[in-house]
């Protein structure tokens, strides 16, 4: 089962399987030698490709030379891929996060080769959106949260459908929220999504999150945001 865009893209070109390691304390503390023997050695590898700055194992002590030596003894071809540059700067996840933090979605999309997305499972919330006529799907967030904040026009990928909507990524200050939450309102949609996985594609930033004096003010602004989102997504 490959639920996320990154995982699906890993299998686009003639790849039958994709294995993902759970990066926990055990894996983090594993020596390079143990990683080679316990992980790579059990996968029947014939060809291995890594980035030219790739390090692995505890304290990043493992490198290309170590893998190449292991490969020569075990009939495994090990190849380094070159660094890809945009101008004089290296493509990197930190550069993408920096672009997103600055709301430069155009640059982020150019670096990613697509728009920024987040895939997650819909979890139960406090149902506030439903009480003000704007039901939302709340997504479970990783501990690291997301490198964005504010209100966005979005496309929601659910099963084989692409749905239009609006999302808020933030702490919901109007109701005294403290923890970051990603809430998504899907236009003209009333299916139960609890427990389902959806993918949110962030298309345009509408505004920053702000604290309103009361729920009526919040509701009024949300409806304005919805109209703006529809215009941006349909145009």
PLM features: what roles do these ranges have?
Residues 13-14, 74:
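Short, structured coil segments at secondary-structure junctions
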Residues 16-22:
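Short, well-structured secondary-structure segments
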Residues 26-109:
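Contiguous mid-protein beta-loop-alpha structural module that forms a pocket-lining wall or clamp
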Residues 71-170:
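Glycine-rich, Lys/Arg-enriched anion-binding loops that position phosphate/diphosphate groups
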Residues 125-235:
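Phosphate/ribose-recognition catalytic cores of enzymes acting on nucleotide-derived substrates
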């Amino acid at each position: 089962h490959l639920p996320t865009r990154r995982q699906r893209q890993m299998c686009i070109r003639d790849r039958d399987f994709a294995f993902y390691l759970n990066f926990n304390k055990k894996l983090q503390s594993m020596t390079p030698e143990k990683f080679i023997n316990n992980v790579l050695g059990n996968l029947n590898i014939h060809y291995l490709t890594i980035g030219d700055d790739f390090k692995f194992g505890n304290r990043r002590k493992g490198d290309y030379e170590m893998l190449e030596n292991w490969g020569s003894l075990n009939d495994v071809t090990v190849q380094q891929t070159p660094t890809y540059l945009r101008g004089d700067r290296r493509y990197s996840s930190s550069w993408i996060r920096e672009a997103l933090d600055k709301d430069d979605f155009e640059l982020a999309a150019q670096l990613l080769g697509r728009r920024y997305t987040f895939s997650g499972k819909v979890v139960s919330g406090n149902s506030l959106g439903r009480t003000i006529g704007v039901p939302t799907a709340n997504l479970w967030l990783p501990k690291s949260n997301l490198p964005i904040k504010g209100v966005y026009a979005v496309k929601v990928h659910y099963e084989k459908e692409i749905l239009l909507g609006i999302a808020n990524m933030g702490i919901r200050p109007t109701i005294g929220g403290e923890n970051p939450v990603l809430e998504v309102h899907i236009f003209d949609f009333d299916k139960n999504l609890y427990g389902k996985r959806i993918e949110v594609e962030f298309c345009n930033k509408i505004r920053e999150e702000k604290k309103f004096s009361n729920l009526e003010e919040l509701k009024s602004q949300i409806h304005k945001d919805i109209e703006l989102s529809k215009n941006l997504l349909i145009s």
